[in-house]
Amino acid sequence: DFLQWVIHRLLHTNRFLWRFHKVHHSVTEMNFAAHFRFHFVEHFIYKGGLYLLLSWLINFELKYVFYIHALNILIGHLNHSNLNINYGVFKYFFNNPKLHIWHHSKSFPKRFANGANFAISLSVWDYMFKTVYMPSDGKLIELGFENIEKYPQTFVKLMQEPFKSNTEL
C-alpha cells in the first residue's frame, strides 16, 4: 500500500505523469463510476508495473496480484462513492469517502499545491507524511481542476489529450 501511495503522489507531482492522471481528476461529480475514469497509460504504469514489481520482489504467485487488484477495485469504488460514512477513529488508518473526496477538490491551500490525500487503502501514510487535507465533510466542494470546462469530455479526446504537445506540463 505504501508503494501505491508513493506512485499516486508521483502522479500528482511529476508534470509528465500528471498529464495521464489528470483524466481521472476530470470528474466533476463524485460517484463510484469516477473510479473507472482513467487513462490506460496511467493504469498500466500504476497498477501493472506496481503489481509485477511486487510479485518479482516478494516472489509471490501472480494469482495473488489479481486478488489484490480486485480488493483495490472494491476499495476504490467505496472511496469514490458519494456515501457519507464516518469511520470514527479508524479514519486515521483506512482511507474513506469523506477523506478521498478532498483529493478530488478543485482548489487546495498553497501548501497542498500538488494535491493531498494520496492514500489508496491506508490513510495512515497521509497522516504520517502530513499530506492530509479534510477541512469539512466535503459535501459541497467543487471537484476537478482549474479550467476544467476546456478539458475534453469524450472518450477519444480524453485518451488523446496527454499526448498532445500543447498539453500543459
Per-range role (PLM):
Residues 1-141:
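Membrane-embedded catalytic scaffold of the fatty acid hydroxylase/desaturase
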Residues 140-169:
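A membrane-cytosol interface segment of integral membrane proteins
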